[in-house]
Amino acid sequence: MAAKREDCVLVTDDDERIAGIFTAKDLAFRVVGAGLKANNVTIAEIMTKNPLCAKTDTSATDALDLMVRKGFRHLPVMDENHDISGILDITKCFYDAMEKLERAYSSSKKLYDALEGVQAELGSSQPQQVIQYVEAVRQRMSGPTLESVLNGLPPTTVSVRTSVKEAAQLMRENHTTALLVQDQGQITGIFTSKDVVLRVIAAGLDPATCSVIRVMTPHPDFAPLDMSIQQALRKMHDGHYLNLPVMNKESDEIVGMVDVLKLTYATLDQVCLPNL
């Protein structure tokens, strides 16, 4: 996982058929968060056995629907011989759709602006269908804000001196894959389940004695409450991170944390605009 910087691995049996799947979250929750030593735990003990799979001829819509209904981020794909063909990542699928939406908006906006110029010169009316189309795309591009997806609970925080083991236990207890790190009341970093795997387990550090300040990401980005979900996803995609703290600019307080999976689920219906 560390070498490939992946957070999901498929497990095969002796016949090279899919036997299970495990993720960075599984390692953080089921190993470190459970107080176990990674060297003493086998993959079979923590993996999800016999995961649901899609087939290569499964439609993208059906695969996406399955992932949303089951709460999966990753979905293995098999061919007609039940051999592994690949793995779908719902967030990457969504980014592709988001870029498609952005391109549609850009090209439609150019057409809209051109028609405005024609109207100004000739006094002709713009085709109503074009106006409606551009407005529909614009609304999907702006979309709901981050405030609409927050649950009202503040993000879980730890101090810079908290051990990785304690941090992983807090993740498990609070059903979150990211914690904010505080030093003297100020947010100085963010620590995630992926950090547990790549920066602690893979590096051979002891979670019980390693403090989060050694392995956290310092000075995380923040987003305002009124940022659109689409803008937040673009920010996360460009910054190569999966979690984003949300700040109320009026009170200067951090009021929540969103992750890429939650935002993807919240906006899937927005990329279903026909004929994009």
Regions found by a protein language model. Give the residues of each.
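Tandem CBS (Cystathionine beta-synthase) repeat/Bateman regulatory domains
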Residues: M1-L276
